Amino acid sequence: MTSRRLVFGLSALLAVLIIGLLIASGVRFDNQDVDPAPASSQESKRQALAEKSTLIADAAKRLAASSPNSSVFPRVESAASAYASALGGVWRPWPNGAPSGRTNPPVSTSAPANADASFLALKLGELSREAVAAANSAPASQRQTYLSVALDARLQAVGVATHAGGKASCGDVDPVAAGKAAATEEALSGVEAARQWLETDVASLPANQRQAGISRIDSIKAAQSAMISSGAKDRRPAVVALPKLAAGETLRGAALKRSSSALVSGAAKADKPNGEAAVSYACSLYATQEERDSAGTLLKK
């Protein structure tokens, strides 16, 4: 009798230990709902942007395969992949397969077989506008990522459209509105550095090739005045040292990157976000395809 009780007691103890280990490892014995919680409005926007970025990368990859001599499509594929990564990727509730009775929601990440350069430019433009909208409603900590995606995608859209013989717009360009949208001390100082570098670059050109550069500098001055009138503290240094250029980088390219970074950063910190003003103006500063090519990918993987 004592032996039976001992065996029973040990069996019960073993069962308790096994159940404890199962619970500790996450096994649940209740009828819990395994469905994910509904996505918030902001998460839905993020997911849509990640999906569209992945679709754009897929379209660019296909176009690159059919146009092996073009550098445009591989560049877009790399950029769009960087967007998707920066945005957190395409979320699936069950990435390794849904449990019995459940299915992963559909995602749109594959480009149509007949996607061409015009389709690619269209989707890049859509992505840019939607990223601006997401930035304007996002927490301040997330805005810079959205606005960086928006600006880079817009530059890529203009480049692809030009390659296809068409035209794409940077949007409604207004340096004063951009300055108001990015009115921070840091943005003002960043744009000041860019302005001084551009002045050095223009001075190195033949006299008959300077007008476009001078007009660009004048527009930056207008943006700076708007920043100051909107409350940005003016602590600009009298002289900004020239940057150390990477291999193949030009002073003009470095200046344009500095200005776009400052505008995006300033707009991301605004109390009342107006990302479109900053993005459209920053895009317009890249006046030629050569300059847009020099931007590279503003977001790195």
PLM regions with names:
Residues 2-301:
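All-alpha RGS (Regulator of G-protein Signaling) helical domain and cognate RGS-like helical scaffolds
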